[in-house]
Amino acid sequence: MRLLKYPLDIHNEQVNALAALGPYIILAGSGGHVMAWRQQQLVDTAFDRVMIKDLKPEVSFQVDQDTTGDIFFITGDLETLYIGSEHRLWGYSGWLCRDTNNINSVEKMNSKLLFECKSPSTITDVKYDINLGILFVLLSNENKILLFRHKTFDKLSEITIDKASKPITGIIDPTGQTFTVMTSDRSILVYQINKTGTHKLINKLTQHVQMYPLHYRISMSPQADILPVINSVKGVPNNATSCTALLDRNNNYKVTKTLVTPSSNGCRVLVYSPAFYEKPNLKKGTSTRYNLIATSGSTDGTILVWNTKRMKPLFNALQVSSTAINDMSWSQDGFTLFAISNDATLYTFAFQEKDLGVALPQTEIKSLQEVNKKLPKLEEPLAEQIPKSFPENIKLEESASAAPIPNDIGRSAVGKKPTKKKTANNQTNGIKTIQSTSMEFNTPSYTVPRDLKRKPKEATPSNIAPGSKKQKKELQPIDFLDTGLLLPNTSFSRIRLATPKIRSTFKYSPINNPNLILDVKNGSGNEQRPTIVKLTSKVLDQDQVLFQDFIPKLITICTAGDTFWSFCSEDGSIYIYSDSGRKLMAPLVLGVSISFLEACGTYLLCLTSIGELYCWNIEQKKLAFPTNTIYPLLNPSLRYSDDILTRAENITLCSITKKGVPLVTLSNGDGYLFDKNMETWLLVSDGWWAYGSQYWDTTNTTGLSSSKANTDSFNGSESNINEIVSDIKNDNQSIINFLECKTNDELNRKGRIKNLQRFARTILMKEGFENMEEIVTLSHLENKILISIRLEEPEEFSKLMMVYCIRLSELGYMDRLNDVFQWLYDDLPISGTGSAFADKDFKRNLLKKILIACGDIRQVQRVTTRYAKEMNIIS
């Protein structure tokens, strides 16, 4: 080992941070002075291969800043260099020339002030996760962590910490799964992070850590299994001393080993070598694998290098500096340690293989990372899950009813916790800010008449076993006057849905016209201070009031159709206005609170808290179909029990199409539509088809955007079934695809989507299930065809029918294929459908295309030839 102690040629400055990036070591001084040295040149100087007088920095420049401040943070990669003080953060892109591996001049670098905070808020740490491409900025006083996207520097999200604690330093996970924060209240917070900035607190460790308002440098092991905790004071009497604990992430963060030395008291810098070492024992024919850790205290200038297998210092540079060590960093190969002291002296510890051991290849480290415990996939926030382009004929409103509603079937006891819903995204100074409105729900009523409570069967002398102990007589409850009033329509209802809580103020803007804003300011719910409802139009940043009304009630939900606006009150009254503010009809009084209120086109859909479903045609001012209920959707037979109250599935979506078809999805993934002709609910999307159907698209989720669908008319000569299936899957206007997307979301949320292939392989090997896949596939296609008829989608119906007939032909289902051909050949129009299906030539033209597509399938030519002759396709 060789040590190079090199005092930097800077006057009256300190160097607080360094970083090993590529072949360079970057230093940042207190006056905004940045220097870059070649690592190999420093190592060669340590081994006397280069004269020390020839040693000089590769480049040196001054950080562009209005007021000079100390630089404490430096991080980045080979593309962008991030340099930060306690109030500002700069980015230097293009600092390294990829072709020559040389540092560009300052003139060729693109510098930009990325972030700035004002006193009393300060930046306590800046970390960059190269795997996720996320930059973490820790802020004190505001007590939060900002997450920015690398390169674009868009704000992804922020992590808010309790007001009583401040984030001191962060620790990056080499695998990009977690981000650990050490706070001023001696707690350690472990967050799960993904590339979109979604985060979740997965652990709050009890391993207390004593942190001071200093700038700490801490890193994890390269295999990402050990989390170091410096200055741990858990279980130490009177806090007389502290130690450095190594926690095993795969064993619920339990302490595996401990470093205890005088210099570890008040540890400030702890950096793992990025290499994983192996030392063979030639006598025994074995080898030992271990990590190396470099540590330094906050006051003395001692540097220790630890072997994690022996837990004893492998190397001890006792008081190598008369001042404290500010920062340390290992080279990528793990054989050089760089350190900077408070007196601006650069230390280069150049080791050899005989000193440290053999560094294993990176592939070995990757394999060790794969052994670590895998975290479940993070669920994206609701606002992130809403697709950018909704189906044209279905509109999900940004109102309370778009959030999952807890519901109780027959008898329900509790409601779901309040959910928060993100709404609009705005761009300000290049940073995307998210405005959110909190939507909370009142739990469903669980009051029942006293006489309906089931009582246990009383014991009589005839049914008491001889010798059994006599039961103690229970005390009878005392009845009081002025007990709570029971509402009969709620207390006797078989369904109880949660209702939105009252918000003091909220705004609503329809998706198809964001310039119109309905502003609701709730009053006290009486004549003394009525609610103000105002519709404004934003044109060229000018607000114009279209209409205003005063309602002596509290408003909960609002929505809008093509030519009308509607909102409902807490007591179940619905108000409907035109765009100019004219009331289209008198208030509709339902007498019970409303859980969902949705509009699309000329239709208004309402779902009450007791499960009643109303659908009005506002243009014709009448019910689209008789009042119905959602009770059959909630599996009443499966939910029955002896208790009065039981839980049911949550309603995650309740909406309506432009043609007046109600749609409902549940938290189990099932999707339904209401058939007004049959006056019953139809199953549209079932999670079972995801397990067995070959035409179920598991990648169709709201977190992914499909390519633009081909909306041109279908060409019957196109016989490639794969192209047709791809065209169907990529149709963003398809309601069926949208409901199947919701099913995939629920399967992902419950972690079932990853078991689909395993389930399919297992079940198909069992006796009697060999043809299960083709049967489920045909069942899935048949259901989609029938639903497309009810939704009056002739384009989608034609494509699905083409795929279905080709599939029947390939599988040899001749009788079923003949049945389909006969149905298409008949002159009878498809019942209960619109003008497109009513055309008498519609089915005949479709049959011609199918016959041409199936004509080259030999095993069904006997069927296709007969119909082709009847239709004069062949002679």
From Swiss-Prot:
InterPro entries: HIR1-like, HIRA-like_C, WD40/YVTN_repeat-like_dom_sf, WD40_repeat_dom_sf
Keyword Oxidoreductase: no
WD repeats: 10-47, 118-158, 163-201, 237-277, 278-316, 320-359, 546-587, 589-626
Modified residue annotations for Phosphoserine: 713
Phenotype of null mutants: Abolishes localization of RTT106 to the HTA1-HTB1 promoter.
PROSITE patterns: WD_REPEATS_1, WD_REPEATS_REGION
Region annotated Disordered, chain positions: 398-473
Biased amino acid composition, Polar residues: 424-446
Gene Ontology biological-process annotations: chromatin organization; chromatin remodeling; negative regulation of chromatin organization; negative regulation of transcription by RNA polymerase II; negative regulation of transcription by RNA polymerase III; nucleosome assembly; transcription elongation-coupled chromatin remodeling
Compartments where located: Nucleus; Chromosome
Entry keyword Cytoplasm: no
Keywords: Chromatin regulator, Chromosome, Nucleus, Phosphoprotein, Repeat, Repressor, Transcription, Transcription regulation, WD repeat
Domain of life assignment: Eukaryota
GO molecular function per UniProt: transcription corepressor activity
Gene3D superfamilies: YVTN repeat-like/Quinoprotein amine dehydrogenase (2.130.10.10)
GO cellular component terms, A-Z: chromatin; cytosol; HIR complex; nucleus
Pfam families: Hira
Role noted for this protein: Component of the HIR complex, which cooperates with ASF1 to promote replication-independent chromatin assembly. The HIR complex is also required for the periodic repression of three of the four histone gene loci during the cell cycle as well as for autogenous regulation of the HTA1-HTB1 locus by H2A and H2B. DNA-binding by the HIR complex may repress transcription by inhibiting nucleosome remodeling by the SWI/SNF complex. The HIR complex may also be required for transcriptional silencing of centromeric, telomeric and mating-type loci in the absence of CAF-1.
Database matches in PANTHER family: MEMBER OF THE HIR1 FAMILY OF WD-REPEAT PROTEINS (PTHR13831), PROTEIN HIR2 (PTHR13831:SF1)
Note: Present with 922 molecules/cell in log phase SD medium.
Oligomeric form and interacting partners: Component of the HIR complex, composed of HIR1, HIR2, HIR3 and HPC2. This complex may consist of one copy of HIR1 and HIR3 and two copies of HIR2 and HPC2. The HIR complex interacts with ASF1. Interacts with SNF2. Interacts with SNF5. Interacts with SWI3. Interacts with RTT106.
Family: Belongs to the WD repeat HIR1 family.
Protein name as it appears in the record: Protein HIR2
